């Protein structure tokens, strides 16, 4: 089974955002060496501890310093941008790195502040229309000089989501679908994975490039050599996932010291417990067993791991352990 990585460009204590982007390159190069299929970067705005706000700029930087791995976005938040401009960007990248570009697309409008400053042209209810326009520019209009540069192939498109409009559009347009098992989603992750994979495959219609259905399972994972170490690494993530002040409470990713000094409310503890039920935490054997539960019900074509842990050394070790599963 193909395995891939999604990196958030974490800014660790004592590091700058610029250093965090360079550490993302280190992870991409390691993933390339270890045979991972894809390496994606996220798009986040107004979140100080996450360094990547312009994945379309980071993607060619990563691709030019790696050899075989697919590089892409996980994902570009399309509602902030013109579908025509996104088509131009992706066509340009495909021309520079043919056969290695992915475009993961999300429909999150972000916070009101982000929406205002990016002057979003589309509402969340118009996401299906946005996707249809993008398909037109990447397919029908591709050989008519409407989108330049004109390229022989188009990047693979994958829609990110947790159901709803995203999975319907992915199936209807013949695109890959990435189901994110995210900590702050209330539904049972196992049951949702089962129902979404069934719905996607039963309603899938092959698109203009006749690609088969492709169901990808994306999970937050904290993996270490021992259970005890994994548990310690997960505690800063617990704090982060509280998401206070629109994830701006911490200006760098939380540390062990933050965990020790943070005063948790009862509501915080309840939220942490709820989030933990959707995280994969443990040593390699424990992580494998937890992943098997999700795989058994959804039969994914690919796995996309999100190793959201502090320190580049621990992220690298996580990647090495994931490659061995």
Task: Place the predicted regions along the sequence by residue.
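Short, well-ordered coil/turn segments that N-cap beta-strands
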Residues: 1-3, 36-38, 66-71, 97-102, ...
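N-terminal beta1-alpha1-beta2 module of alpha/beta enzyme domains
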Residues: 1-65
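An alpha-helical appendage that flanks or caps ligand/catalytic pockets
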Residues: 124-146, 188-300
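Flexible, glycine-rich active-site loops centered on histidine and acidic residues
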Residues: 2-17, 79-141, 185
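Short, acidic/polar
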Residues: 18-30, 163-168, 284-293
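Conserved, mostly hydrophobic/aromatic
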Residues: 3, 31, 35, 43, ...
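Active-site mouth loops of central-metabolism enzymes
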Residues: 7-22, 76-84, 151-162, 275-284
């Amino acid at each position: 089974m193909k395995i891939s990585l999604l990196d958030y460009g974490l800014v660790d204590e004592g590091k700058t955002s610029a250093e965090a982007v360079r550490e993302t390159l280190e992870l991409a190069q390691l993933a390339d060496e270890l045979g991972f299929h894809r390496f994606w970067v996220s798009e986040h705005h107004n979140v100080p501890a996450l360094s990547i706000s312009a994945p379309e700029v980071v993607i060619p930087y990563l691709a030019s310093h790696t050899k075989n791995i697919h590089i892409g976005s996980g994902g570009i938040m399309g509602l902030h941008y013109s579908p025509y401009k996104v088509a131009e960007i992706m066509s340009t990248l495909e021309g520079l790195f043919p056969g290695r570009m992915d475009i993961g697309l999300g429909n999150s409008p972000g916070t009101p502040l982000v929406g205002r400053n990016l002057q979003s042209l589309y509402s969340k209810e118009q996401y299906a229309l946005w996707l249809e326009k993008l398909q037109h520019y990447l397919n029908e209009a591709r050989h008519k000089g409407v989108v330049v540069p004109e390229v022989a192939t188009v990047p693979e498109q994958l829609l990110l989501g947790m159901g709803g409009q995203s999975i319907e559009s992915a199936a209807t347009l013949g695109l890959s679908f990435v189901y994110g098992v995210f900590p702050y989603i209330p539904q049972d992750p196992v049951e949702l994975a089962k129902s979404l994979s069934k719905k996607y495959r039963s309603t899938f219609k092959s698109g203009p490039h006749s690609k088969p259905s492709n169901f990808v399972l994306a999970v937050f994972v904290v993996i270490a050599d021992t259970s005890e170490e994994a548990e310690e690494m997960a505690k800063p993530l617990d704090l982060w996932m509280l998401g206070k002040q629109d994830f701006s409470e911490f200006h760098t990713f939380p540390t062990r010291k933050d965990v020790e000094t943070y005063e948790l409310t009862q509501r915080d503890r309840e939220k942490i417990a709820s989030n933990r039920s959707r995280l994969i935490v443990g040593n390699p054997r424990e992580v494998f067993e937890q992943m098997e539960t999700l795989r058994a019900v959804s039969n994914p074509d690919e796995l996309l791991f999100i190793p959201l842990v502090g320190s580049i050394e621990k992220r690298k070790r996580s990647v090495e352990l994931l490659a061995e599963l």
